């Protein structure tokens, strides 16, 4: 009994694939939880001489836990050279007229929550965090703790440094932050990575299995063609059923050089193209394994028009033809063979057995013996 055919995994294949698909679906849902990102419109205003300059643009992104509302105020950076506001004792130069103000803080040094907390404790209405140096105007939605009535926005490093330089020059800079557009992000980078790996794996295995099926189909066609050619070739070789009184079964007759057994009545012999004959059950596997006559080394398959490839191993050929070359004749074949005159051992066979060191490969059997076999035309189908 084959456990691969009766095991529980074979009978519950649909359930197994359904469970596998459900697991992948749950992982995908966990990886691609939809998240909304809100952009921020920022109207930056400052005085240059007697002129008021303003710059309006969608240059910021609200934090994930930030409240979404309009806020305006004076932009105030932390005091000192360190602008990350990670120190709980960080102070800000507050406006003299106590107007609302918004903290301008550099990213890095600590978590976003810590920066927002420090600015909130100092009375800021909002927090603008600008990105690392070298990141240009890149922004992303920050993850932080939610604070009541505090607007949190990230802007690019370039824009943040422009505002900071103006403030350090003594320019009074104000900003108005308004809620911009909503963007829904369904795919985060974890899910994208997962999908890339999964797609590449599926593509590889699909290509691998298609190639295996293609190669197997070609091999199957080649083996079928070879089977037909071998059956046709073996059918061209003469066969004979020995009888009582034949010279081959006499006590002084030669034996089969493959099994070293003497020929007996009712045994089937196959006669090769070189006129040597052997037990059919002995010579058929020998030809499949070697392709030549065991006595004169004549290439039997080549003489029959069969071109064997190197990869066609002898074991594979024997397994392939084991069910294709029957070991016994049908009743009709036996009846026809019984009507033939007894086969005679060729002089070549006798010569090899008596004088093994002086084998004459090119010799031909006497004409009298050839005429004694006028009906060597029976074929093994």
UniProtKB/Swiss-Prot annotation:
GO terms assigned for molecular function: ubiquitin protein ligase activity; zinc ion binding
Domain (PA) ranges: 65-167
Zinc-finger found in the keyword field: yes
Assigned EC number: 2.3.2.27
Catalytic activity, as annotated: S-ubiquitinyl-[E2 ubiquitin-conjugating enzyme]-L-cysteine + [acceptor protein]-L-lysine = [E2 ubiquitin-conjugating enzyme]-L-cysteine + N(6)-ubiquitinyl-[acceptor protein]-L-lysine
Name of the protein: E3 ubiquitin-protein ligase RNF133
GO biological process: protein autoubiquitination; ubiquitin-dependent protein catabolic process
Domain of life assignment: Eukaryota
Gene name tied to this protein: Rnf133
Keywords of this entry: Endoplasmic reticulum, Membrane, Metal-binding, Transferase, Transmembrane, Transmembrane helix, Ubl conjugation, Ubl conjugation pathway, Zinc, Zinc-finger
Renumbered residue ranges of the record's region Disordered: 340-381
RING-type zinc finger span: 256-297
Subunit (UniProt): Interacts with E3 ligase UBE2J1.
Pathway where it operates: Protein modification; protein ubiquitination
Species of provenance: Rattus norvegicus (Rat)
Membrane disposition: Single-pass membrane protein
């Amino acid at each position: 009994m084959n456990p691969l055919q009766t095991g529980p995994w074979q009978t519950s294949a649909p359930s197994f694939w359904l469970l596998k698909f459900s697991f992948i679906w749950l992982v995908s849902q966990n990886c691609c939880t939809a998240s909304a990102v809100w952009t921020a419109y920022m109207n930056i205003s400052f005085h240059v001489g007697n002129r008021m300059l303003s710059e309006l643009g969608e240059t910021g992104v609200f934090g994930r836990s930030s409240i979404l509302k309009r806020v305006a105020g004076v932009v105030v950076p932390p005091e000192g050279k360190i602008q990350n506001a990670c120190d709980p004792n960080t102070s800000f130069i507050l406006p003299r007229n106590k107007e609302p103000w918004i903290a301008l803080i550099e990213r890095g040094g600590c978590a976003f929550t810590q920066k927002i907390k420090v600015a909130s404790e100092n009375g800021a209405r909002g927090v603008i965090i600008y990105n690392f140096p070298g990141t240009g105007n890149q922004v992303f939605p920050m993850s932080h703790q939610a604070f009541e009535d505090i607007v949190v926005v990230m802007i690019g490093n370039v824009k943040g440094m422009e505002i900071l330089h103006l403030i350090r020059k003594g320019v009074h800079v104000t900003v108005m932050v308004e809620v911009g557009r909503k963007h829904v992000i369904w795919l985060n980078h974890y899910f994208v990575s997962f999908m890339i790996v999964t797609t590449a794996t599926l593509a590889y295995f699909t290509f691998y299995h298609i190639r295996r099926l293609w190669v197997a189909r070609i091999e199957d066609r080649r083996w079928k063609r070879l089977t037909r050619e071998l059956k046709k070739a073996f059918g061209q070789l003469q066969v004979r059923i020995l009888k009582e009184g034949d010279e081959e079964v006499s006590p002084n007759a030669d034996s089969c050089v493959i099994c070293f057994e003497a020929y007996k009545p009712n045994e089937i012999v196959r006669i090769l193209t070189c006129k040597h004959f052997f037990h059919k059950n002995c010579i058929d596997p020998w030809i499949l394994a070697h392709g030549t006559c065991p006595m004169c080394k004549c290439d039997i398959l080549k003489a029959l028009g069969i071109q064997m490839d190197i990869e066609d191993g002898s074991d594979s050929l024997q397994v392939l033809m084991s069910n294709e070359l029957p070991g016994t004749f049908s009743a009709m074949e036996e009846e026809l063979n019984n009507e033939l005159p007894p086969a005679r051992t060729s002089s070549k066979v006798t010569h090899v057995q008596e004088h093994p060191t002086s084998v004459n490969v090119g010799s031909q059997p006497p004409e009298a013996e050839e005429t004694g076999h006028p009906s060597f035309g029976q074929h093994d189908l």
